């Protein structure tokens, strides 16, 4: 019987072959060699991702394509978890890059016998700024603050299978945005041990179109859906001051776009 890999990277993918190739190269370059990468193709229509993975000629790459009638990032993430052979599950979007020791650190940080999630610092980069810069704030975990805003950057997360199973349901299919926030909120309520790790584990690619007004409107609607489905009590955004680092408070309260994104539409003084 084959021994399961120490770490499984979970990679939902759709088109963007060059970015996926770079993401997989960052897996292949890991200092820990005992890993697998589970790539779930969410109906790519302008790229042959299966052929791309074949050309890499690495048996640790595990590819599947969603069936007709299936689709969406939540379904792709759930399928990746289901196919993963390791008890340590590491988030990697198809356009992001692992740092070389990420798998080794996740092996050290996660105990498969426990329901645990860790999140690290991330480095923000783009095509125009390939070196990038660290995301400025790493907020220590606060369950009370997570009820109000999502301070966990999804590309920097890793968790045990026990943590994923703790809420009783994985990523919910009704979400095409904020699906990570919904899951992490339910994990926290289910008693998962969540911890910030003050290390850079991943580089998070920022796209030019990622901050458009239309996207922010859609994301705000998804955040409100998370709050309603999870019966989060209405709150004034200023309440984050009781739990958040001063720099995070400034980022959310002094920036009109961020304030609009995270404000609770249900709150009335």
Task: Give, region by region, the residue ranges found by the protein language model.
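Glycine-rich, basic loop-to-helix element that forms the pyrophosphate-binding segment
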Residues: 67-84
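Conserved nucleotide-sugar donor-binding catalytic segment
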Residues: 140-223
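Conserved donor NDP-sugar-binding/catalytic core segment of glycosyltransferases
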Residues: 101-132
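Short aromatic/hydrophobic "clamp" motif used to bind/position activated sugar donors
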Residues: 89
